[in-house]
Amino acid sequence: MTLSRRDFIRNVSVLGGGLTLGFTLAAPGQAAAAASLAPNAFLRITPEGEVIVQIHKVEMGQGTVTGIITLIAEELEVDPATVRYKMAGVDDAFADPEYRLQITGGSNAMRVNYEPLRQAGATARAMLLQAASQRSGMPADQLHATLGTVRSSDGKTLFTSAELVTAASQLDVPEDAPLKSAAAFKLIGKHDRRLDITPKVDGSARFGVDAPMEETLVAVVVRPPVGRGPMTSYDDRKAADLPGVHSIIAIDAGVAVVASNYWRARKAAEAITLEWAPGESSLTDSAAIDAALTAALDGDSFASVRDEGEPPATAARQVLEAEYSVPFLAHATMEPMNATVDPKSREVWVGTQAPDLAASFAALGLDVDADEVTVHNQFLGGGFGRRAMPDHVLEAAQVAAALGQRVKLVWSREDDTRHDFYRPPMKSRLKAQLGDNNEVISWQHRLAGPSLMQATVDAMAPAVVPSWVPGFLVNFGADMAGRKDSSSVEGAEELPYAFSHIDVAYRNVETPIPLGFWRSVGHSHNAFVVESFVDELAHACLLYTSDAA
């Protein structure tokens, strides 16, 4: 995405006497036309000179806290260790410019924020320098910012940032605050101290599972063991009389057991028996799913993914074929799924990759509008795509709404493994033709597997479709009509090799098993398949060369 500095929409206001800068990450014109499409992050400098940054891309171990602060601190000329940060709440202004949702995923946090975040720091720096120029009578180009101070060209400290904030907040925002050259970087590419390590070591970091426990009940859910098949009946008589049990109620996902603490809820859950319907699909075991994928590869009706070059006109010296299969995979985040919901204040404490979706699912469970819900996002004990799906938030909201009091819902590790939104299974069949000089004169790749994006849209639909349908959902829905799912074929489509003829095609095979995004998405399986087959081709060429010698 290209964003010029002049298209960098700036708003400035006095907030408690401080300097607050809003800055857009959106494409040109979007912010002015509709604020809901203009993602905003906020840099605030208090009258005391404290720099506060809202982290709108969640921290789940990948370093976004450090990355975001480093970009701003580089241009603002402050020590990143002195910057205070807060996890951003839900706001349309924080929506990702590529996804149109307030979501962290796709490895784009630094890519889409690199220049806008630097611009925010540079703009604040320029305003502080201008304020210093007015107070000192010295030209601004003879002043420079260093470690929260403004100094003259001879190195003399003239002002601290705190002394300039009020005056700076009254200035017009410069249209084109200059960015530093790469040669002048002091932090970018050099600063390697993780700013989230200390709180994680000393225990002050708050994860979703660390939500406040005052007057909070704990819930676990007993679920049907096969997929998400519907429950038909349950027997809770043995569980109801166990110590600490508060309530046992049926929700959409199964039976929620609510108790005074997690252990009592879990022990009571073990005493409940369920009856459930198997569902309509026969594809509920590995053998049946594998057979369906094989049948799809044996058939036709493939959607073309990439077709380049001409098929070879001459016979190949050698033809190689291979078939690869990859299974469902659970994310197995270190921190199990959890969410705490207060139905009275309509607050949610959760570690989520998608705060706005969490608010929508909580609203669905509480039967309120999403804008009435406040999400307190926390550190994530692993995300990997799993925490973009807020099913556990819906469960917690349904239980809290039924009881009328705050509830913390916690999954077990077994829940996490059995009821994940899994990486989809995929089967690939590849065929390559080698020429006389060991060149690949034809590459054919057929893929069969479920549509990850269609499954994701279906899972999100209950909460998001009634009130709004983001453009990306509409686009992907249309994409599915053509039976091509880019999220399932990436890594196979973007083949990096200059083969003479490339033919890649995909066939959608739906299964009833819930699917979700995995780190690297389609590359997770397709990179393995493509590179393994390239290795097989290289091995075949090596053997041919050795034999010829």
Name each model-derived stretch.
Residues 549:
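Thioester-forming pentapeptide GCGEQ
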Residues 1-546:
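Structural alpha/beta core scaffold segments of enzyme domains
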